[in-house]
């Protein structure tokens, strides 16, 4: 039953001569439905990136309602220079130990005080 949907997710790739095919999917978790959990676990490893949303943040009107520590991309080293990757990882380490709401509020504060991504990621 999962073979057809998994083949669709596997279709995401770079297209010769430029461009790419991007597949975006959502999964509702923590529903207390065993079937939802099974489906989520089946597809979890097929993505290249995961953006984990947090209901608590949305309820508090903190946007984007993203759990920074639980969100990320695989193979980040292919997307930026080693220096940028290192700076991103350092920022993530600073946020990882915080509750999701405090982590996002901290990140939003840093973003407000920065004029650019380069400034945000500059070593302290």
Annotate each language-model stretch with its function.
Residues 1-124:
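P-loop NTPase catalytic core
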